[in-house]
């Protein structure tokens, strides 16, 4: 089964917890704190494997969680960093954050890697908190939680040439006779439901990858006839081969077919109609095909080359393949967006996240609810089993301005404050 879009959950491994320990060893006076740091959690990494052709594996396993780092140990021994979770994906996979809709990675080359969910850093042991005022601290940090998110994987096939056209115009037959591909061929619409790739080689030794894309119909850019699933595979092609049925047996006018398909390509955006296009007048072995071709050429205003062929009798195929190879030699990788769009839409990720430290809301029952990534991360990294850690957390909250913000919201002694699933009293 060909799967080209799937939604999965990924989570980086949590960092290992730091340790509270002290050195008690003979002949070592004033040993002091000796708790080691926790190890870093594993990253979730996607790696391109050119042997894969579909996202089928993600259909059955949709949750990926890297392992956590090892906890710190006594004698200032740090926990081991966890191994990364490496997941293989086919070339042409685009990874998008399901929440923000931002593209995380566009994976096209064999061996290319991208970190999709980073593991959390390890918590610090008590030796990290030793100061002249507190030479024997009884506190440590829990490991930082790993990044977690839902992502959408979208496969856009990597082909040099894309065959487009209405259903049953002969695209699959054409691919089957010019390459070793064996697509399903039958006399009904939408026989082809998934892209088929074939390696084509011309008589002079030039080769390229051709994709037989499922048939398009009017309204495809709006999703009609599964149009979105089909059109996404045209995005990476450098040359478009537009196959038109000249027999007229379907009762449609070939020129109207041509206009309809090009309108769908232009409506899909990504400047698909600006790419080199070759018109293939197929089924020229049929009785009225020659007459229909002449009428088509009279109406045609675009400066695209027209090649009359018959995929069944193989008439005209040699000239067509030479023209496709020539077009590819003169056509570089086509940019999906122009410079202005890139300037407007590209997001630069930096180490400094401009995030709101915390938010305060109030439930109908009068409970003040705290939220925010920074505050929640601080809460999760605090070891509440130790008094010093609790006091440090309270100081950090005051430093972030949480206490003052609660007072401004009307919080008084004894009011209930909720953070995640935990509740505590506000003390002014």
Swiss-Prot record:
Subcellular locations according to the entry: Cytoplasm
MF (Gene Ontology): GTP binding; GTPase activity; magnesium ion binding
Annotated positions binding Mg(2+): 172, 192
Effect of a null allele: Essential for growth, it cannot be disrupted. In depletion experiments cells become over 3-fold longer, are abnormally curved and nucleoids condense.
Start and end residues of each stretch annotated as Disordered: 117-143
One cellular component term from this protein's GO annotations in UniProt: cytoplasm
Family (UniProt): Belongs to the TRAFAC class OBG-HflX-like GTPase superfamily. OBG GTPase family.
Assembly description: Monomer. Interacts with TasA (AC P54507) in pull-down experiments.
Function of the protein: Necessary for the transition from vegetative growth to stage 0 or stage II of sporulation, but sporulation subsequent to these stages is unaffected at 45 degrees Celsius. Required for expression of early sporulation genes, further suggesting a role in the induction of sporulation. Depletion effects on sporulation can be partially suppressed by missense mutations in spo0A. Strains depleted for obg stop growing after about 3 hours and do not induce the sigma-B factor following ethanol stress.
Note: Estimated to be present at 6000 copies per cell.
Record's protein name: GTPase Obg
UniProt source species: Bacillus subtilis (strain 168)
């Amino acid at each position: 089964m060909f799967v080209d879009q799937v939604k999965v959950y990924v989570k980086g491994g949590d960092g290992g917890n730091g340790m509270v320990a002290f050195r008690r060893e003979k002949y070592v006076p004033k040993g002091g704190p000796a708790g080691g740091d926790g190890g870093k959690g594993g990253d979730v990494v996607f790696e391109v494997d050119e042997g894969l052709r579909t996202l089928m594996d993600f259909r059955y396993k949709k949750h990926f969680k890297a392992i956590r780092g090892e906890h710190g140990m006594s004698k200032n021994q740090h926990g081991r960093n966890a191994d990364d979770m490496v997941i293989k994906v086919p070339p042409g996979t685009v990874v998008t954050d399901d929440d923000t809709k931002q593209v995380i990675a566009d994976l096209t080359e064999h061996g290319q890697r991208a970190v999709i969910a980073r593991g959390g850093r390890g918590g610090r042991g008590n030796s990290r908190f030793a100061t002249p005022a507190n030479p024997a601290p009884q506190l440590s940090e829990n490991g930082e939680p790993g990044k977690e998110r839902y992502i959408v994987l979208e496969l856009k096939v990597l082909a040099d040439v894309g065959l487009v056209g209405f259903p049953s115009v002969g695209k699959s037959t054409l691919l089957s006779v010019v390459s070793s591909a064996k697509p399903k061929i039958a006399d009904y619409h939408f026989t082809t439901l998934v892209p088929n790739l074939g390696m084509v080689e011309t008589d002079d030794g030039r080769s390229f990858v051709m994709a037989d894309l499922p048939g398009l119909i009017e309204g495809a850019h709006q999703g009609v006839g599964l149009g979105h699933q089909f059109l996404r595979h045209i995005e990476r092609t450098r040359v478009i081969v537009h196959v038109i049925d000249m027999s007229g047996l379907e009762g449609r006018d070939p020129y109207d077919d041509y206009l309809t398909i090009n309108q769908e390509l232009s409506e899909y955006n990504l400047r698909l109609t600006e790419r080199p296009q070759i018109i293939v007048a197929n089924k020229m072995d049929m009785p009225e095909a020659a007459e229909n071709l002449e009428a088509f050429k009279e109406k045609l205003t675009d400066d695209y080359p027209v090649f009359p062929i018959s995929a069944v009798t193989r008439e005209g195929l040699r000239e067509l393949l030479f023209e496709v190879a020539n077009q590819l030699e003169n056509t570089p990788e086509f940019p999906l967006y122009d410079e202005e769009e890139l300037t407007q839409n590209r997001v630069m990720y930096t180490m400094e996240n401009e995030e709101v430290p915390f938010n305060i809301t109030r439930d109908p029952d009068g409970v003040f609810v705290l939220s925010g990534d920074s505050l929640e991360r601080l809460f999760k990294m605090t070891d509440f089993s130790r008094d010093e850690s609790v006091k440090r957390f309270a100081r950090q909250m005051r430093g972030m301005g949480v206490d003052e913000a609660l007072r401004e919201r009307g919080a008084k002694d004894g009011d209930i404050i909720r953070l995640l699933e935990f509740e505590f009293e506000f003390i002014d």
